[in-house]
Amino acid sequence: MVEATAQETDRPRFSFSIAAREGKARTGTIEMKRGVIRTPAFMPVGTAATVKALKPETVRATGADIILGNTYHLMLRPGAERIAKLGGLHSFMGWDRPILTDSGGYQVMSLSSLTKQSEEGVTFKSHLDGSRHMLSPERSIEIQHLLGSDIVMAFDECTPYPATPSRAASSMERSMRWAKRSRDAFDSRKEQAENAALFGIQQGSVFENLRQQSADALAEIGFDGYAVGGLAVGEGQDEMFRVLDFSVPMLPDDKPHYLMGVGKPDDIVGAVERGIDMFDCVLPTRSGRNGQAFTWDGPINIRNARFSEDLTPLDSECHCAVCQKWSRAYIHHLIRAGEILGAMLMTEHNIAFYQQLMQKIRDSISEGRFSQFAQDFRARYFARNS
């Protein structure tokens, strides 16, 4: 796959347009130099410069317009400077469409040991070899530039959950100072400022007043898009939806809204109802490798013995290449035997299912029937467990 350099097209650096609305739900497009992203969008996670078990062309064939890369993992292995030397992340991995990179802040806190936070940034030991590293707003933006990211995320502090109001406030305030430093670092690089987009991240834990302060600070700095951070960290769906109900309306309406690290199909439907436009999550890839397939009738565990002679596809309504060719019985056998092909087929199906879900969401918003779609989706998805 030949890399499409950001300079080769007539498309804008970044342009978001909303084509239709229903309630708080919106559908539209993000135009960038490397391609158009249909929203609401689900971004498969390509942690280490690969969506695990899938070739880039397979990821694209599922309907994905954009993927996510992880700054933390790539800075440690193979290294951001090495990727830049080898032509950038798009060329390196053979994906010619947009890539969003996270800032590394979440992984630093969740994966590395002996982290030490200061106003400057975070020092930490690599989970791979124990080597010491420093990640600051400036270094995070530099790494994302070296990778050649299309959508760059501001560096933030991931507030632990649960947090007291005072702890959440001090964490949010530091994240806002880091957001300004991220903006300045991004703008200081002409190539990055002219070809990529920068998103800010709203923090404030579950507290409405802190979320409002954070949204106001981010809007004053100015970003191309706005993420809702600090959710999907163990608070549960009800609490997440409660926070989204008041948090999303605080963000600029004319910019994309990105819910980081979410989620299950029903999380996505509920978040779209609350005005979210972009999602990413490891769930379809990770759970696929472990034998969980997503279907319109809810998830199934393909390892279960009841599928050992089931000749039907993973989902009878799925249009993916896997469901056109292979049976539950065959994939059951592959997963039980630990065969690599099992992980490949399960992952491809799950990513395709998520993309078909997003297409149905977009179509139903466009046609003014999203609330009915959401109701029907939930009734069927949870019917087995009711």
UniProtKB/Swiss-Prot annotation:
SUPFAM superfamilies linked to this entry: tRNA-guanine transglycosylase
Binding-site residues for substrate, renumbered to this chain: 102-106, 156, 203, 230
Pathway in which the depicted protein is active: tRNA modification; tRNA-queuosine biosynthesis
Annotated GO MF terms: metal ion binding; tRNA-guanosine(34) queuine transglycosylase activity
Entry superkingdom: Bacteria
Glycosyltransferase is among the record's keywords: yes
Ligand binding (Zn(2+)): 318, 320, 323, 349
Annotated HAMAP family: Q_tRNA_Tgt (MF_00168)
Name by which UniProt lists this protein: Queuine tRNA-ribosyltransferase
Species of origin: Zymomonas mobilis subsp. mobilis (strain ATCC 31821 / ZM4 / CP4)
Protein encoded by which gene: tgt
